[in-house]
Amino acid sequence: MEIAPGMLIAHMHGDWNAEMRALIASQMKAQVPTLNAAGPWGIINHMHDTLVYGPDIYAQTRADYANRPAGSRLQAVAFVIAPHVEGASLLRSRFESLLDGVIASRVFADSQSAKEWIKVQLQLLDASGPNPGN
């Protein structure tokens, strides 16, 4: 887990199951008060090894973002999925639509592009107000 100005960067390694997902979610949630206090922010979920997860992982991820607290200042979510990640060619599209209608989100092949997009989303927010979805 990394914190950068206006960003929480979570590095997802190994095979994912409900327990591992819950552990990472709790670690991320522990950072939320600090991030909210600093202003609007975004998350980058960097998938390093695989996208081959059970359907419950996808459903719970969507539910967590949809049910974030009303006071949350989270404004955008980026997923980093490099072409070499297991399942990327077949499952990337799942991430491209995972958060449609929930929060602004996008998928990138590299971390730098994801960081730049998050920064732009936060700048757009400054100019126009919150963006509740894609």
For each feature predicted by the language model, list its residue ranges:
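Amphipathic, Lys/Arg-enriched alpha-helical "gate/interface" segment within cytosolic domains
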Residues: 1-134
